[in-house]
Amino acid sequence: MAKTSAKKSENKAKKGTQTNMWTGRFASGMAQSMVDLSFSLQFDAELIEEDIEGSIGHGKGLVESGVLSKADYKKICDGLASILKDYKAGKNLWKESDEDIHMAVERVLTERIGALGKKIHTGRSRNDQVCTDFKLYMRHRATEIRALEVSLMETVLDLAKKYFGKMMPGYTHLQ
């Protein structure tokens, strides 16, 4: 059975059709409308910083558990940093075949540092990556919102000091 599945994947690759990480034992692929629906890169590319941050943290855990050497971890971190730098510089790193930000980052990393790039996926699922990315994203946005709140409070305080003692019309509602 493994030979048959490998042969089908080989044939699909030769024909130029797309094979995704979730294809496997099925003889035919998903309907194109479902494939289009499941691709989220255009939406979750905004999570690139969080995805890379999560991968760096996960890599550290792999080093601590003895799965990854410190030298390999450094290569992975350098590769991830170069991806983020290129993304911020406006370089288009993505391909149409990239289903989501996780697969896109892993693909680019593997292209840059070789098979070592695939090790970053060891011991975690895409669901783990999605949850981590969203938690980091929300933490970052909450920090930004707190900074804006502080700025607003400082502005209100400055205005209160500037206009202290001045009359100001106030209404609880319009009637």
Give the predicted meaning of each segment:
Residues 2-175:
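A helix-coil-helix interface module used to build multimeric assemblies
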